[in-house]
Amino acid sequence: MFAIISSAKTLNFEKLAPKTELTIPMFLTLTNKLLSTLQSYSENQLSKIMNISAKLAHINKERFKDFDNQESKAAIFAYAGDVFNNIHIEKLTNHALNFLQSHLLIISGLYGVLKPLDTIKPYRLEMATKLNEINLTNFWQDEVTNYINKILAKQENKYLLNLASQEYSSVINPNKLKYQLVNVHFKENRNGKLSTIGINAKKARGAMVKVIANNLIDSPELLKNFSYLGYAFSTKHSSDNELVFIKS
C-alpha cells in the first residue's frame, strides 16, 4: 500500500532536520521545465497567477531566480501546515520513517510526486496554478499515474490510499490506475448534514499518516480502528473504495 498526501504552501527550512540518507526526486527534468517558465515571470505576474501578496511574489521570484543555490531539505521535514504538523515527524523512530519512505508519496505542483526523504528546495506552486498554457494537473497526470502503477506493482498489498485534497489527488488518472484506489473522508455532523471541515480533516489526515508509520500499516482494512479528534469509522457510510470517518 502507498498513501498519498498533498504538499503544503507553508515551509520550514529554518529548523534543522535529523541526519538521514536523502533521495532525489523522480521527475527533476520536468521540474526544470516548470522552473524555466516560472523564472520568466515578473513579480507582478507571479502575484496575479498565484494570487499572493507582492511580498510573497518577491520572495518566490528570488527563490526561482537562484533556485539551484537554494538550501535543500527532505520533503517530509520541509513542509509544514496542518497535515504535516500532525504527522509529528520529529517523534517518529528511524524504523517508522523508513517505512514511510516506502509507503507514502507527497503530491507536488513543482515536483510531481515525492518520497518523504526526497530533497526539495523552497518554492510555492499550487497544483491549481495555471502557467501560460500549462495545466499542472494535466502536465503531471500521466507521469505520476504511471509511476504509482510501477511502485504498487512491487507491493504485497496493491492499494493507493488517498489522503490528499481533491486539487492534488486529481493528478491520479483513475482510468489508467491499475490498482484499487481507496479514498479517505473525514466528516462531521453539522445540522443533520455530513460535511468536511477543512482544518479538522487536514489534522486527521496527518494523524493517519502518523498511525500508518508507527504501526507499519500496509492495508486500508487495518485503519478502521483509527480515531483522532473524535472521528470514528462509519461502516454505514463506507465501501470498499471509500473509508468514511465521522466526528460525532
Swiss-Prot record:
Q: Which Pfam families does the annotation name? A: H2O2_YaaD
Which cysteines are disulphide-bonded? Answer: none
Against InterPro entries, the record matches this protein to: YaaA (IPR005583)
GO CC annotation, single = cytosol
Q: Name one GO biological process term.
A: response to hydroperoxide
Family assignment from sequence similarity:
Belongs to the UPF0246 family.
Name recorded for this polypeptide: UPF0246 protein RPR_00055
Originating organism:
Rickettsia peacockii (strain Rustic)
